[in-house]
Swiss-Prot record:
The keyword Nucleus applies. Residues 640-654 have a biased composition (Basic residues). Residues 3-37 form the SAP domain. Residues 137-147 have a biased composition (Gly residues). It is found in: Nucleus. This is Heterogeneous nuclear ribonucleoprotein U-like protein 2. The keyword Nucleus applies. The modification Phosphothreonine is found at residue 165. Residues 226-419 form the B30.2/SPRY domain. Binds to MLF1 and retains it in the nucleus. The modification Phosphoserine is found at residues 161, 168, 185, 188, 226, 228. Residues 40-242, 627-666 are annotated as: Disordered. One of its GO terms (cellular component) is membrane.
Length: 747
């Protein structure tokens, strides 16, 4: 096993198999594994060659790529190893230490082959993390999420390459992972007499909470090794549809809501991966008068992973255009929840009955009374009026059918069916039967994806990116921007109800982690959807900016940089901490500062603007942040080792490439090096004196002539035996000649 050629994930897998600590940077892991292999070798020799704990785990040597002689290959190698260190750092912060074993007992290797273990470790970088346990079942009207989350869902890794693009920026000085029991109490040390820098230790918080910025940084590191993003899938061509039909609107629906082909139903796209995620859609038409109804049926509860405590729920009702996608959690948004609750503007009250799989809910809107009345029915049974809406406050806004579901499949009847699930009350008509001129159509999506635009936010945590994005989207309603950010996804993952008990730290941390993972998938879906988007993330790394914007190849791509002055930024960070209850880890903040650079207009950035301070004012602040962070981040010893190894490799390449000049081999004495290396008086003796010192011993042992007569009789006897064998076994001789002499070799 060549330890130096193993990747971080492979090193971790081998260490875990032996019950050893798998935390640390690559150089530490390699040293730890090499010591374990040496110990096993000594045990084998002492015990007569018995197999040790790692005896059966001989990894196949990985092919060594030809090292380029130019600077580009060196930069890519640096970036690859630095990114492995970055991933190792992030994994260490989440990794639980292995269970302590009895003294003197060896760890039992798993039954699976080492190749499979290495592949599994490489495919799942977070495999060492332990899932959070759910603390309670699904009892109560608020479902199972209020007491705790289900099993942890690991993000499906994408195929990644081992190197980064030359144009991307990778952290220059990575902090070394500190080991030992005293890591929580030891603090940064000031520079001593030898001039060493003050270091900020990377360590796991005792609260096991990280916050949005940490997991956003983690996702960025997870995807940062792709040379270039996969090209977006070709969008299916829209067939000519009857624009007078009432069906689900794919332009305003959630990206993670999978609308059926006939657009009269749908289901969540990530129900198995993210079971806490709500998703839904509105209809293409709304109404402002008359007595109108529609039906919604829960056709199926989607299966969930074993141990998941989440429940399947449907919320159905009415909402106005431009309201939030979470039905019942915004003004002029009214929903009836499967837990027997009604919701309006985020306020929940008990109403009607609970409902679930195979139940049909009728939704009725009566505009002919003094106030607009919204009522519901279950399987044809009237449940009464749930909401009364003032016509003055509603004004001329139209009410649109709206569904929101979690882990279930919903089917809608707007009147397109020949027969309804249940007959509606007298004088009520399905919305599809309302004349087209009396309906209100929602916005029509762009005809081509070239008409769409994407805005990439760039800035440190707490700089005000989200506020800028929400304000800009509100000021430009005709664009209908979809703001994709961790906070947006978190709102769609939180369960609201009559009571909202606080989640335990582990469950809250897991929810934030899942939101970051879900956001990465939504960005990929957005790149092939005809809408306008604002990517509300930090995006301080050039590699992350490039990777995301290249996904939106046919969009109009803009970048907005938000850099406030230092005083405002500190105030916003404090306010962010008060509102969200978490702080940005210092090590993550330093990494972001050290690698924050202002983007420039290029082939994948059509426009770069500044949301607060202009570039001339922002540049000195960013430069100051970089310098301060790099002073606090400890230097990486690994970087120095790599540079020395690279110089050694370059010397070897030069000697191979310049070994022959003019058809004659150049000797050591002809090398273009200083005379001090070739044994001049007063110097170290050099290579030539060292070589001559042992030349005599070499010649005495290896320089002897071969004595043929001494071994002639020995070989002659074996030759007779083989001839006799082939004489009595001609079939073997023929097979031997065919296999050996029949092969013609390379031509």
């Amino acid at each position: 096993m060549e330890v130096k050629r193993l990747k971080v994930t492979e090193l971790r897998s081998e260490l875990q198999r032996r019950g050893l600590d798998s935390r640390g940077l690559k150089v530490d892991l390699a040293q730890r594994l090499q010591e374990a292999l040496d110990a096993e070798m000594l045990e084998d020799e002492a015990g007569g060659g018995g197999a040790g704990p790692g005896g059966a785990c001989k990894a196949e040597p990985r092919p060594v790529a030809a090292s380029g002689g130019g600077p580009g290959g060196d930069e890519e190698e640096d970036e690859e190893e630095e990114e492995e260190d970055e991933e190792a750092l992030l994994e260490d912060e989440d990794e639980e230490p292995p269970p302590a074993q009895a003294l003197g007992q060896a760890a039992q290797p798993p039954p699976e082959p080492p190749e499979a273990a290495a592949m599994e470790a490489a495919a799942e970088p977070d495999a060492s993390e332990k899932p959070a346990e759910a603390t309670a079942g699904s009892g109560g009207v608020n479902g199972g999420e209020e007491q705790g989350l289900g099993k942890r869902e690991e993000d499906e890794p994408e195929e990644r390459s081992g190197d980064e693009t030359p144009g991307s920026e990778v952290p220059g000085d990575k902090a070394a992972e500190e080991q030992g029991d005293d890591q929580d109490s030891e603090k940064s040390k000031p520079a001593g007499s030898d001039g060493e820098r003050r270091g900020v230790k990377r360590q796991r918080d005792e609260k096991d909470e990280h916050g949005r910025a940490y997991y956003e940084f983690r996702e960025e590191a997870y995807h940062s090794r792709s040379k270039s993003p996969l090209p977006p899938e070709e969008e299916a061509k829209d067939e000519e549809e009857d624009q007078t039909l009432v069906n689900l609107d794919t332009y305003t629906s959630d990206l993670h809501f999978q609308v059926s082909k006939d657009r009269y139903g749908g289901q969540p796209l990530f129900s198995e991966k993210f079971p806490t995620l709500w998703s839904g859609a509105r209809s293409t038409y709304g109404v402002t008068k008359g007595k109108v109804c529609f039906e919604a049926k829960v056709t199926q509860n989607l299966p969930m992973k074993e141990g998941c405590t989440e429940v399947s729920l449907l919320r159905v009702g009415w909402s106005v255009d431009f309201s939030r996608p979470q039905l019942g959690e915004d003004e002029f948004s009214y929903g009836f929840d499967g837990r027997g609750l009604k919701a309006e503007n985020g306020q929940f009250e008990e109403f009607g009955q609970t409902f679930g799989e195979n139940d049909v809910i009728g939704c009725f809107a009566n505009f002919e009374t003094e106030e607009v009345e919204l009522s519901f029915s279950k399987n044809g049974e009237d449940l009464g009026v749930a909401f009364w809406i003032s016509k003055d406050s509603l004004a001329d806004r139209a009410l649109l059918p709206h569904v929101l579901c979690k882990n279930c499949v919903v089917e809608l009847n707007f009147g397109q069916k020949e027969e309804p699930f249940f007959p509606p009350p007298e004088e009520f008509v399905f919305i599809h039967a309302v004349p087209v001129e009396e309906r209100v159509r929602t916005a029509v999506p762009p005809k081509t994806i070239e008409e769409c635009e994407v805005i990439l936010m760039v800035g440190l945590p707490g700089s005000g990116k989200t506020q800028w994005a929400l304000k800009y989207a509100k000021e430009n309603p005709e664009k209908r921007y979809n703001v994709l950010g961790a906070e947006t996804v978190l709102n769609q993952m939180r369960m609201k109800g009559l009571e909202e008990p606080e989640m335990d730290p582990k469950s809250r941390d897991l929810l934030v982690q899942q939101a970051s993972q879900c956001l990465s998938k939504l960005v990929q879906i957005a790149s092939r959807t005809k809408r306008n988007f604002i990517l509300d993330q930090c995006n301080v790394y050039n590699s992350g900016q490039r990777r995301k914007l290249l996904l939106f190849k046919t969009f109009s791509r803009k970048v907005v940089v938000v850099v406030p002055n230092e005083e405002d930024w500190k105030k916003r960070l404090e306010l962010r901490k008060e509102v969200e209850g978490d702080d940005v880890p210092e090590s993550i903040m330093l990494e972001m500062k050290a690698n924050f650079s202002l983007p420039e207009k290029c082939d994948y950035m059509d426009e770069v603007t500044y949301g607060e301070l202009e570039k001339e004012e922002a540049q000195p602040i960013v430069t100051k942040y970089k310098e301060e962070a790099r002073k606090l981040l400890p230097p990486s010893e690994k970087r120095t080792n790599r540079r020395n190894n690279r110089n050694k490799r370059n010397r070897q390449n030069r000697s191979r490439g310049q070994g022959y000049v003019g058809g004659q081999r150049r000797g050591y004495d002809n090398r273009a090096y200083g005379q001090q290396y070739w044994g001049q008086p007063g110097n170290r003796g050099g290579y030539r004196n060292f070589y001559d010192r042992y030349r005599g011993d070499y010649d005495r042992f290896y320089g002897r002539d071969y004595e043929y007569n001494r071994y002639r009789d020995y070989y002659r006897q074996y030759n007779r035996d083989w001839q006799s064998y082939y004489y009595h076994h001609p079939q073997d001789r023929d097979r031997y000649y065919r296999n050996y002499y029949g092969y013609q070799g390379y031509r």
